[in-house]
Amino acid sequence: MCLMCGDATLDHAFALAERPGHRLTGRFWSGTFEQAAAGALHPLIEEMKLLSASSSDLWKSPIVGLTWNDRPDGFRYFLGIETEDEAAGFERLDVPAMQCAGLWHGAGAGTVVESYGRLMRGLREAGIARDQSFCGQREEYPPDIDLTAPLALRLLLPVRGSNRGTQS
């Protein structure tokens, strides 16, 4: 398994993985859970795919989504990529280093909400505390994700035990 995925074993439903601090280029979105479930984020994901494809970087960053559950009727979401290229019209977000518990969500895994539920249950059973001081969730999509196929992405929850920064 690669450094980005962490060390998963057959007796665990999730793996712990380190994410270094980095700067993302992308866009903020705000909306309801219902809007997101109905595909409201798809145009933003497609926009990030185009940004990634136009990047001169040798390594293609995953498309990273960060969630802030900051109101009862919905949430804020930042979707972006790590790139050295300047991108006019996009926002930059400095993301601190973090340790995350994560799992892959793919075809046959149920809904994303069900997968997050499995991940949260696994953390509780393992006695691992979440750290929502920067963001609530982190999602990583392949840079060439096909949104017409069953959704495949890495779901990550920041956990205690690493340094945190602040949103800028």
What are these regions (language model features)?
Residues 1-168:
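A solvent-exposed interaction/effector surface
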